[in-house]
Amino acid sequence: MEKISRNKQDGAGISIKDQIKKFAINGLYGFNTIILIGMGRKLGIFDYLYEKTKSISNANIVKFTLDELAKKLNLDVNYLDAWLHLALECGLFEIDDLNRKILKTAPFVYELLINYDHNSYIGGTLGAFYNIAPAQEIMLKNFKTGKAMDLLKLPSDVVKDLQERSRRFGKLIEKLFTKSFTSFCKNLNKKGSILEVGCGYGFNIETWAKKYEKTRIIGIDIDPKGILAAKKLVEENNWNERIKILKKSTHEYAHTTKEKFDLIILNQVLHEMNPDENYRNQLFKDLYLLLNDKGILLVGESMVPDTFAPREPFKLFDITHKFSEAGSARFYNEKTFKAFIDSTPFTKAEFIKEGGTKFWTIRK
């Protein structure tokens, strides 16, 4: 094997100092940030900060004290002090200029990590990565056995967090879809209907229900815990008259209802379904039955390139998605997904992409 000198490596524009910074310094900051966010969500810290400011118009900074959090959330002061100290070092919070005992959120942290109603919120996405840790032992065993991991058998709070990872992508997709199909969306909001397949805990339904206030929505799923959470969400928002949540498979629903929908949504669901091509082909036959003749099937999926394909921009989350669900999911890339659609009754498929936001619109 050819011996590669340090100078030759440096000649490629990367020094050993660069790599130390990347792996040891930046890596540790990133790792600690994920730990802080995950623990902050589990301990209720971010929820408390959200509730504290949600009634304030245009709030973008939250101020608080260590003692306040300890008292309100019944947390040990020593552990909380250590968490806050690391959060200060990682840039989540800052010390207030006027009072050194008061902390405040760093710029844009409120929008990114606390206010889950904000379009830029990524707390759910980053918080979900925290849950890779408890799944590591299962993943390590599966490296040897090749067994699939049943995500629904993980603790319900972990499953909920993993599904919330899709909340941000769902919001971005809705925003881009509404911008790209203005005429269709105007009619959808007047008297239209939406079916979400694999509605889970209702995060995506919440996004569309708030934007399309006159649209009827049906959500279906086979996970009983997700169904209960989605129904609770509907009740809390007084949406019972126009939104129904049903515990049914797509095949069962397609063959027991006469209703047709203007928009059918599959948001980060297809990859988790049975990987067998015949099963998925039947799924799309059922979706074809449920869609109006002029309707749109919207599929939001991570498009994962081949491992040895040339590197593409905006693929970190897609490839991380593949890694976190390896063995229990089957993904497509743009070429293989288009080939799959060509094998179904649908005749038109368009890939919509803007930056890192992407989805497919499929028609009869």
What are these regions, as identified by a protein language model?
Residues N26-F31, M39-G40, C90-N189:
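Conserved Class I S-adenosyl-L-methionine-dependent methyltransferase catalytic core
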Residues L298-T344, K348-F351:
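C-terminal alpha-helical "lid/dimerization" subdomain adjacent to the S-adenosyl-L-methionine
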Residues Y201-E213:
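Conserved SAM-binding loop of SAM-dependent methyltransferases across substrates and taxa
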Residues H251, H255-I264:
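A short acidic, Gly/Pro-enriched loop at the edge of an enzyme's catalytic core
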Residues A230-K231:
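Conserved SAM-binding loop
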Residues D223-K225:
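Conserved SAM/SAH-binding beta-strand->alpha-helix loop
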Residues D262-E277:
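A short SAM/SAH-binding and catalytic strip from SAM-dependent methyltransferases
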Residues N281-D293:
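A short glycine-rich, Lys/Arg-flanked "PGG" loop and its adjoining helix->strand segment in the class I
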